[in-house]
Structure formats: C-alpha cells, structure tokens
Amino acid sequence: MAETKLLDGRLIVTTGDITKMKTEAIVNAANTSLMGGGGVDGAIHRGGGPAILEECKQIRKGRYPDGLPTGDAVVTTAGSLSAAHVIHTVGPVWHGGGSGEADKLTSCYRRSLEEAANLRLKDVAFPAISTGIYGYPKEKAAEVAFAAVREYLASSKLPETVYFVFYSPADARLFLDTVNG
C-alpha cells in the first residue's frame, strides 16, 4: 500500500514494520511493566536490544515503581533501532466501552505527542494502540486515534509529521475507511 496523506500532509497512513521506521521516534504499545511483551511491544524490545529494557528498568525504579499508568507515556532510547527514541504508552484494555477506554486511548496519543514535542522531534510513528491483545475494536480505535491526533496537530507545530503504521494493508484500509466516513 502506498502512503496516504491526511490533515494537509501532516498525518501519513502506511503499512510496514514500525521497528524499521526512520522517524525520530516510534511509539510502543507497552504494558504497565515496561518490561516488554507480545506484539509491537516485544518486536520493539527485540529490535532495539537491551538498552531499551535497561532504561525501562531505571524508569520503573525511579518515577514509576508501580508501573506506567494507562494513558501515560515515557521516552527511552531506541537502542539499535533506526529511530532515536521510543515513546512507550500504555493503552487501555477494552471492557465494552463503558470504562473510560476512549478517554484513556486519547490520552495515549496526546501524551505521546506531547513527549515528542518536548524533545522537539519532527516526526513520530504510531502503531494501532490497544487493538491487539487488549481487544479494542479497530474501527473505534481508529476514530479515537484520528480525532486525538487531529486535535493535537491543530494547536501544535511539533511534531510536523505523524505516521500511523499498520502491519497489514487490511488494517490500514479499515482505518482509512473509518476516518473518511
């Protein structure tokens, strides 16, 4: 699938392996432990090597001894990945939609973008947060993700470009179909 540009070219939807993105930062759909896991989280930890885990351990010892709260974000090195930074955020587990999941997912995107802007990063790449093992319905997650990024970019110059990186063309198409009505 070719890249699709939205929001005056500031949002780019593409497919591929997020660990191979050459953006200044990639976002990790982490768990609260920050110790790596399955899916994107495991792939990022494996691809970046031990430097990511070591920095996550230091974060756990310091700021977040009980784990990173859902909806928050922290930045680490990207180790041996192409990106310079990994922004770890913890998405909500889907419980039917009545447990504040949309607000928590919005916070994941907003906090990740704030962290990128604080570092003066020009671009950042997101996976589809919470749509894997956490069970967030992909259409609903697409609506939340798009709205959160659109709102953030409307009032912030940085990051200049946001990528949504989908592993499969089908998921990218579903996202585009959802946000284009």
Question: Regions from the language model: what does each represent?
Answer:
Residues 1-181:
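Macrodomain-like recognition of ADP-ribose-binding/processing modules
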